[in-house]
Amino acid sequence: MKPATFDYLAPHTVPEALDALADSGRKTRVLAGGQSLILEMHLHRIHPELVVDINRITELDTLSVADHTLRVGALVRHRAFEQEHAVPGPLGSLFSRAVVNIAHPPIRARGTMVGSLAWAHPASEWCALAVALDADVELHDTNGVRQVAARDYFRGAMRTARRPCELITSVRFPLLDDDTGVGFIEHRRTHFCFAQVAVAVALTVRDGVITKTRIGLVNAADRPIRAHAAEQTLIGAEIGAPPAEYRIPEDHPFARAGQVAAEYDAAPVAESYAGVDYKRHAIAILVGRTLCQAAADERSRTTTSGGAR
């Protein structure tokens, strides 16, 4: 199908884009990668009166690090993160593990991280990473700029704190400490489907004891969530040598954390190919496995750097 008739504007500066978004009398959508927007327009699920194409605003196509913070501009494509050295330290490794799960190469070449946050699909890898890693979303309008913590930005499936007059110009992630181990595992029906469940982990261990952990859950509720209850069960736990991902003893801290995440943190929404009980089971299993992956990564980093465990 063809989309309904709409007006098109391609500004060259952020102020021009903001002026267009300030016209509250029109239904307006912002176009960056367009990998979700264009499809929905073709299917007549959304009918914007004006499409503001920001691809000519070159200042938005920037990736920078300052003050231990990564800033990702609104036009930075998914594929920019496929190589782990694109971002310093363990954060780059985590991003590279996550991004390969996003659709396929042509979509990763056009779609953007910030576009994923704007769309706010519960199965988005980037959205869960933003919540788990305490990212901030930068929102501009004609009156100025505001920062919204990712944990407060997502309001539900496809709903966010962004106002119609605002443009997301960037998202900011704190860098992870060099001795942080990371893991990301995704389960989906076929390779190009949305995630049925996915888990992201960042883990720090000192002398065999877990001192810090972050667990992000993808498609485990109507919005991306951080598994705070599961994280609390891990602080102070002794893990010894990481178990094999597929052979985790039931009494191991990683297995217990998975059960807590499934029972207390997650609020799954049933889908055609994944009911609530199925998702809870998958969450429990994947949290344990991803923690194993992160622990092995942490051990590798510490051994390589010669640090004490």
Q: Positions of the model-derived regions?
A:
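C-terminal structural segment of proteins
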Residues: 1-309
